[in-house]
Design a protein with these regions (language model features):
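Short, exposed "boundary/linker" segments that immediately precede the start
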Residues: 1-5
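Alpha-helical interface subdomain recognition
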Residues: 6, 10-55, 59-60, 64, ...
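Short Ser/Thr-interspersed hydrophobic loop/turn segments at strand-loop and sheet-helix junctions
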Residues: 25, 48-53, 145-146, 162-168, ...
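Short Gly/Pro-enriched turn/cap motifs at secondary-structure boundaries
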Residues: 62-63, 89, 104-107, 131-134, ...
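Short beta-strand-to-turn element immediately C-terminal to the catalytic PLP-Schiff-base lysine
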Residues: 75-77, 117, 143-147, 162-164, ...
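A short, Trp-centered hydrophobic/proline-enriched beta-strand micro-motif
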Residues: 92-100, 144
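Flexible, small-/acidic-enriched active-site or ligand-binding loops
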Residues: 111-113, 166-197
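A short core secondary-structure module
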Residues: 122, 126-172
Length: 358
C-alpha cells in the first residue's frame, strides 16, 4: 500500500524506500555506468518515472528528486566531481537537490540574488532559496549563485556551485501544508557565510544560466512523464470505479456519456505519452529539441489536470473524500503546470521559437 494512502495528510519521508530503489536500479538510470548508474537513456528514465507516478505521485516525486540535477555533473562536471558525487546518488546512499528558486526569482531566474564571492581559495555564499526539493533532507545541493554581478550581460552573471548541507551556515526549514506530493521533501534554505572550496564550482564561472538551460532541456522531457503517469493512474482509478458502480440499474460505465469521457481521457494520455517519449528519444540520440521538450512538459501537465478532473467527476461525491485515491491524485496534479517551468514559460519558449526573430 502506498505510504500516502495510509497517511494522506501527513508529510512523510522514507529514506529506506530510496535505498531500496537504489538497490533495484531505479535511481540514476541515465547516469553512466562508470559513475554507478545504469548507463541507460532519458527514455528509460521517463518510462520508470511514469510507472511510479501511475501508482503514487508523492513517492514518485521523491524518487525522481534524488538525482535532480545530476545532468549538470555529466555535462559540465570534472572527473573528480563525477567520481565523488554521482555514485552515492545512483546507489541511493546520497540525496541531492538543485537550489534555484528565490523569493523574488521564480520564472525570472536571472533575478536570483544569492551571492557567491571568491575569497581566497573558497566561495563565500549568502542568500535564501525557497521551495527546494530535498532542501532539508539532501546531502548536497547545487546552488544557482550570483558570481559576476557587474557583467553587463545578465545571462553571464551566475554560476552553479556544489554545497554540502553539513557545512556551517547552511540551514533549512521544512515546508508543510503542501497541496499535494506530501511524501516528497520541500524546504526553504538559508545560506549565511557558507564557505566551500573553489573546486566546488560546477562548470565555468559566469556560465551558470547556460548550464541551467541545458539542464531544463533534459529534465523537462522526463518530467513530462510525471503528467503521463499521473493521468494514466487517474484513468485506471476511474475505470475501476465505473466498472463497479451502478446507477439507474446499470453500471455507469455502460452509459455513452461515460464512454465518451473515457475516450477523450485515453486519447489525451496517449498523445502526451507520445510527445514525452519523442522528447526523450531525441535527447538520447543527441538531437535534443527545446521546443519539443517544452511542448511535452506543457501538454502533459495540462493533460494531467484535465484527466484527473474528469476522473474525480466520474467518482461523484465519493471522489471528494480522502479515503479515495483519486483525491490524492487530484491534489498532486496542479503542480505539474507550475514546477520545472510554469506552463506560461513553456508557451513563451514555444511561441518565440516558432515565430522566429522579429
Amino acid at each position: 500500500t502506498p505510504y500516502p494512502t495510509l497517511f494522506p495528510y501527513t508529510t512523510l519521508f522514507r529514506s529506506e524506500l530510496i535505498k531500496k530503489a537504489g538497490e533495484l536500479g531505479f535511481l540514476g538510470v541515465f547516469i553512466d555506468e562508470a559513475y554507478g548508474g545504469a548507463g541507460l537513456g532519458f527514455l528509460e528514465h521517463a518510462i520508470i518515472l511514469e510507472e511510479f507516478w501511475r501508482v503514487d505521485p508523492g513517492l514518485a516525486q521523491q524518487l525522481c528528486s534524488v538525482s535532480f540535477g545530476a545532468e549538470e555533473f555529466l555535462l559540465f562536471g570534472t572527473e573528480e566531481q563525477k567520481q565523488k558525487f554521482l555514485p552515492p546518488v545512483a546507489e541511493g546512499k546520497s540525496i541531492m537537490g538543485f537550489a534555484i528558486t528565490e523569493p523574488d526569482a521564480g520564472s525570472d531566474t536571472l533575478s536570483a540574488a544569492t551571492s557567491a564571492v571568491l575569497d581566497g581559495d573558497e566561495y563565500r555564499i549568502n542568500g535564501n532559496k525557497v521551495m527546494i526539493g530535498n532542501g532539508s533532507e539532501g546531502d548536497f545541493m547545487l546552488v544557482f549563485c550570483l558570481t559576476n554581478p557587474e557583467d553587463i550581460r545578465r545571462s553571464r552573471r551566475h554560476s552553479i556551485i556544489i554545497v554540502e548541507t553539513d557545512r556551517p551556515g547552511y540551514e533549512a526549514d521544512t515546508l508543510h501544508g503542501k497541496m499535494g506530493l506530501r511524501a516528497s521533501n520541500t524546504a526553504n534554505i538559508f545560506l549565511s557565510d557558507v564557505r566551500v572550496p573553489k573546486e566546488n564550482l560546477l562548470g565555468k564561472q559566469g556560465n551558470g544560466f547556460a548550464q541551467l538551460m541545458a539542464f531544463f532541456d533534459r529534465s523537462r522531457a522526463y518530467v513530462a512523464a510525471h503528467g503521463v503517469g499521473l493521468s494514466q493512474g487517474a484513468l485506471d482509478l476511474a475505470i475501476a470505479h465505473i466498472r463497479s458502480r451502478e446507477q439507474f440499474g446499470r453500471k455507469i460505465g455502460s452509459f455513452q456519456s461515460t464512454q465518451f469521457k473515457i475516450a477523450e481521457m485515453a486519447t489525451k494520455i496517449e498523445l502526451a505519452r507520445t510527445i514525452a517519449h519523442k522528447a526523450c528519444t531525441l535527447l538520447d540520440q543527441g538531437k535534443g529539441n527545446t521546443d519539443i521538450t517544452a511542448m511535452a512538459k506543457m501538454y502533459s501537465g495540462r493533460t494531467a489536470v484535465e484527466v484527473v478532473d474528469e476522473a474525480l467527476q466520474l467518482h461523484g461525491g465519493y471522489g471528494y473524500f480522502n479515503d479515495q485515491d483519486i483525491e490524492r491524485f487530484y491534489r498532486a496534479a496542479k503542480v505539474l503546470e507550475i514546477y520545472e517551468g510554469a506552463k506560461e514559460v513553456e508557451k513563451m519558449i514555444i511561441g518565440r521559437n516558432t515565430i522566429g526573430k522579429l
